[in-house]
Swiss-Prot record:
The gene is SYNGR3. It is a multi-pass membrane protein. It comes from Homo sapiens. Residues 20-172 form the MARVEL domain. Interacts (via N-terminus) with SLC6A3 (via N-terminus). May interact with VMAT2. This is Synaptogyrin-3.
Length: 229
């Protein structure tokens, strides 16, 4: 298919790096990529603190190791997904098959919607566990990391919801058949059937018409005629 489809130009067209970097979808992916680092980075570095009763490390979120693991997994998954989808956006212009483009947009739409929901769950979960955390020297030391993870979890909800909306717009846009249809219609309308050649050597536009059928009646008497003497 030569026409544009799913918000991209014709297959094989050159990619403009400046326009690609200024696209809202690209900016949202970069923002989501940065937010994911700001979530799992502080949890990995400062999310586990020593308890007052022993040297073992516990999660800063109310000692719930599941909260720390969930935050790290969510942020790391978003980090890898943003990198993969950025690469897909770069290669999207080179995909010539409309079916493959549709699958790529559906994958983007489904993953963005799923991660928007997971970020909402993660934000609520981390906030709830942090509110239940008992104050102490350890929690005071890692408090900034916990609050940063919660804040950027909220920002990630907004960025991934925006990515979902952009993917939905691309899916609804679908295949743009207007260029292809216009070219075909204009070509068909302007092309005429050739006429028959005339004596001057120039093709005429008049159509050949057969002469009307005329029947000549024979009025002479039929049969044997007696000669006159």
């Amino acid at each position: 298919m030569e026409g544009a489809s799913f918000g991209a130009g014709r297959a094989g067209a050159a990619l403009d790096p400046v326009s690609f970097a200024r696209r809202p979808q690209t900016l949202l992916r970069v923002a989501s990529w940065v937010f994911s680092i700001a979530v799992f980075g502080p949890i990995v570095n400062e999310g586990y603190v020593n308890t007052d009763s022993g040297p073992e490390l516990r999660c800063v979120f109310n000692g719930n190791a599941g909260a720390c693991r969930f935050g790290v997994a969510l942020g790391l998954g978003a980090f890898l997904a943003c990198a993969a989808f950025l690469l897909l956006d770069v290669r999207f212009q080179q995909i010539s098959s409309v079916r493959d483009r549709r699958r790529a947009v559906l994958l983007d739409l489904g993953f963005s919607g799923l991660w928007s929901f997971l970020w909402f769950v993660g934000f609520c979960f981390l906030t709830n566990q942090w509110q239940r955390t008992a104050p102490g020297p350890a929690t005071t030391q890692a408090g900034d990391a916990a609050r940063a993870a919660i804040a950027f979890s909220f920002f990630s909800i907004l960025s991934w919801v925006a990515l979902t909306v952009k993917a939905l717009q691309r899916f609804r846009l679908g295949t743009d058949m207007s260029l292809f249809a216009t070219e075909q219609l204009s070509t068909g309308a302007s092309q005429a059937y050739p006429g028959y050649p005339v004596g001057s050597g120039v093709e005429g536009t008049e159509t050949y018409q057969s002469p009307p059928f005329t029947e000549t009646l024979d009025t002479s008497p039929k049969g044997y005629q007696v000669p006159a003497y």
